[in-house]
């Protein structure tokens, strides 16, 4: 049987960089990981609660965390930053307070900055959120996958593969359906592959969405 591996972890150090940049003693490492998870969850929850974009897409590509002894630098890569940049100082300040409360670390300085993603639909997280929104609105999963591929083609990618698994269209038996457009060379290490795994809750149950996007070859 074929052994599956996460395409991002497989390419770390070649075409993929770490999203968390910090060092810690082995005995304190788990605390740093938990802290990162709290920061990411807090930001995602805040954006989700305050989102007013009609598409329902949060547009968070990824969140990068850099830590020094007394400073935590958080960079949010957003596809649709209008929401946070409209009332920028107020919203970012509010977000900073929320994160600091969650971490309970008033002795360390927290900086949050926003970077706009030029081609949002080149990022599988943004695309997965779009598909999840369509499925929640009871759009057929095949239509949702087709529309997602069309959006990606506008971003000049070389290939995309989308897989949705679960009780599709409310059927009794769960199954997995996938579609591929272009090339997606998962075995080639120098191929820059963007990947995400996303869970969406629908009225029929939980569906899993996986997206692989072949961006370029280095």
UniProtKB/Swiss-Prot annotation:
The keyword Transcription regulation does not apply. Residues 43-118 form the KH type-2 domain. PROSITE patterns: KH_TYPE_2, RIBOSOMAL_S3. It comes from the Eukaryota. GO terms for biological process: translation. SUPFAM superfamilies: Prokaryotic type KH domain (KH-domain type II), Ribosomal protein S3 C-terminal domain. Keywords: Chloroplast, Plastid, Ribonucleoprotein, Ribosomal protein, RNA-binding, rRNA-binding. It is found in: Plastid, Chloroplast. GO terms for molecular function: rRNA binding; structural constituent of ribosome. Part of the 30S ribosomal subunit. Belongs to the universal ribosomal protein uS3 family. This is Small ribosomal subunit protein uS3c.
